[in-house]
A protein has these predicted regions:
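Short beta->alpha connector loops
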Residues: 11-13, 71-74, 122-124
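Conserved hydrophobic packing residues within short motifs/helices of P-loop NTPase cores
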Residues: 6-8, 90, 117
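Short, Asp-centered acidic motifs that coordinate Mg2+ and/or phosphate
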Residues: 31, 65, 115
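Short, well-ordered alpha-helical microsegments
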Residues: 40, 75-76, 128
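Beta-loop-alpha module in the N-terminal Rossmann-like domain of NAD(P)-dependent dehydrogenases
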Residues: 17, 47-108
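A contiguous active-site-proximal alpha/beta segment in oxidoreductase catalytic domains
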Residues: 96-144
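N-terminal Rossmann-like dinucleotide-binding module
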Residues: 1-47
Length: 144
């Protein structure tokens, strides 16, 4: 049986992620929600997936993971709510809208073994390029 994933935030990026999740092996179902009450049913209908009126029901409904693409100001609270329910979490950047909130999220996450990933790719960062080149050249040996 595949995973049931919650998607919170259905703007451009949230919709993009939801569409990709629907074609991902191992994902059987999505539950989508957005703070815009009109957007949620429209996107749910468009994608033919379940919906919820607000983020709490998906987090309380036995989902296997959550993808947060909501407004930046809501990230910290949503990450913490998911982690406290032992739900593996992927959140678009930024992790929070302040240093204090970021520290709070980190402290909450460190109290559990729940995976949390922030979608902050650095593909063209010089340090990443150097690490990528080292892996590709075999300089670091076999990476798994």
């Amino acid at each position: 049986m595949g995973a049931r994933i919650g998607v919170i935030g259905l703007g451009r990026i949230g919709r993009y992620h939801a569409r990709n999740l629907l074609t991902t092996d191992g994902v059987d179902a999505l539950v989508v929600t957005d703070v815009d009450a009109r957007r949620t049913p429209d996107v749910a209908s468009e994608l033919d997936v379940a919906s919820a009126a607000d983020p709490d029901p998906p987090l309380a409904s036995g989902i296997d993971g959550v993808l947060i693409a909501a407004s930046s100001s809501s990230h910290a609270d949503l990450i913490e709510a998911a982690v406290r329910r032992d739900i593996p979490t992927f959140c678009e950047k930024p992790v929070a809208d302040s240093i204090e909130s970021s520290v709070r999220v980190l402290a909450t996450a460190e109290q559990t073994s729940v995976p949390v990933q922030i979608g902050f790719q650095r593909r063209f960062d010089p340090s990443f390029v150097a690490a990528y080149d080292a892996v590709r050249s075999g300089e670091l040996g076999w990476i798994h």
